[in-house]
Amino acid sequence: MFINYAHRGASEYAPENTMSAFNMALQLGANGIELDLQRTRDGKIVIFHDNKIDNKSNKKGKISDYTYQELLDFDFGSWFSLKYKGEKIVLFEDFAKKFLSKSLTFAIELKDEGIEKETFDVIKKCNA
């Protein structure tokens, strides 16, 4: 079987690793999604690729510098296009609830050490 991976979602058409990019990937016919996971300061697992948020949001620093609640106040879409102003960072559990039940293949890169068990627990919980 051929897998058409949407790298960080449909990142050519919407801000990478956002719900807009993941939804667009499905609309364009992707049957696989690649995404990256990191841990916030308060231990939440979010989807984000870069080491720093500087180029993909309206703030500066690392994901681990902020709580998930703080990150929700940031704009992760305007860097790509004003059409996506206000785009939010994605909690992995929210992604999993929406997409794991679909007939897709996933490539998940863990950017932080020690998040393997939590990631697997979310997958088990949302894929039951």
PLM segments and residue spans:
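Phosphate-group recognition and catalysis centered on beta-loop-alpha active-site segments
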Residues: 1-128
